[in-house]
C-alpha cells in the first residue's frame, strides 16, 4: 500500500498516523507484545539493546495508541540491523507494520542492513532489496542432565571483555562493543571464554529469559572448544528448565547434536541482507546472541 493510499484510508476512518523513536519506557509495550508471541525475551536484553542506538527503536501510533514496532539500530557508519517487526494483535492486516518500516528505515540512511525475517515476510523483504543468505533455527529443549563445569574455562569479566569484543568482531564482521560490554554481566547473566596461547578461541553467553534461559552467543574455533563452552553454559541452568538457542544452519553438526539431546526446532528465520554482508567468520557461529539484534 502506498503512503498516499494509506494516508487516505486513515483520513476516511478519521484516524491519525504518527511514528517516532521510542524511549526505553515506551518500548515496554513492545516487550509485552513479544512475550505474548512467545519470543522468550532475554531478561535485561532491552536495556542492552538501547545502549547501541537509543534512536533506533520506532513505534507507530494510530490516534496516539501504539500499534506497531520496528527497530533499525545503527551499529556503525556502514552497518545496521533491523528487528522487532511487530503489530499489535488487534491492528494487523491494515498495513501499519509496512508503513512504520518506511519511516524507520530512514534512520539507517545508506547503511547495509541485516535482519532475521520470518518465512511469511521473506517476499516482502525481498521487495525491499533484501537477499536471503542462510537460515537460523530456533531450538528449544528442557535441560534435564547433570552437567559438571569443565576445566579450562574462564568467566568473562572486566579484565577480559575487550578481548571477547575483539573476538566477536572477528566472527561477526562488525564491532559490537556497545552491545557486549554488559551482555555477560548482571543478574541472571553469565559469560565464559576459552583462551589459547594466541588469544580467545571461544565464547559463550547464557541468560535468564521469560520462559527459562537463552543461550548465545556461542562461537568456537573447534569442536572441543564448543563442547566445553556448551557444557559450561548448561551448568548454570537448573535441571528441568527450558533452554532456547538460535542456531544458524551454517553448523548443522551443532544443530543435529542438539536434536539428539531432545531439542526441537519450533521455527526458523531467514538471515537477509540489503547491501553488503559483513565479512566475518560466520562458519564458527553455533548460536547468535539474539534474533532481535543479531
From Swiss-Prot:
SUPFAM superfamilies: Acyl-CoA N-acyltransferases (Nat). One of its GO terms (molecular function) is acyltransferase activity, transferring groups other than amino-acyl groups. Its EC number is 2.3.1.-. It catalyses: marinoloyl-CoA C + holothin = thiomarinol C + CoA; pseudomonoyl-CoA C + holothin = pseudomonic acid C--holothin + CoA. It holds the Pfam family Acetyltransf_1. Keywords: Acyltransferase, Antibiotic resistance, Plasmid, Transferase. It comes from the Bacteria. One of its GO terms (biological process) is response to antibiotic. Gene3D superfamilies: 3.40.630.30, 3.40.630.90. Residues 17-146 form the N-acetyltransferase domain. Pathway: Antibiotic biosynthesis. InterPro entries: Acyl/Acetyltrans_Enzymes, Acyl_CoA_acyltransferase, GNAT_dom, YitH/HolE_GNAT. The keyword Acyltransferase applies. PANTHER family: SLL0310 PROTEIN. Acyltransferase that catalyzes the formation of pseudomonic acid C-holothin (PAC-holothin), a thiomarinol analog, from pseudomonoyl-CoA C (PAC-CoA) and holothin. Accepts linear CoA substrates of different lengths, including propionyl-, hexanoyl-, octanoyl-, oleoyl- and dodecanoyl-CoA, readily converting all into the corresponding acyl-holothin adducts. In vivo, is probably involved in the biosynthesis of thiomarinol, a naturally occurring double-headed antibiotic. This is Holothin acyltransferase. It comes from Pseudoalteromonas sp. (strain SANK 73390).
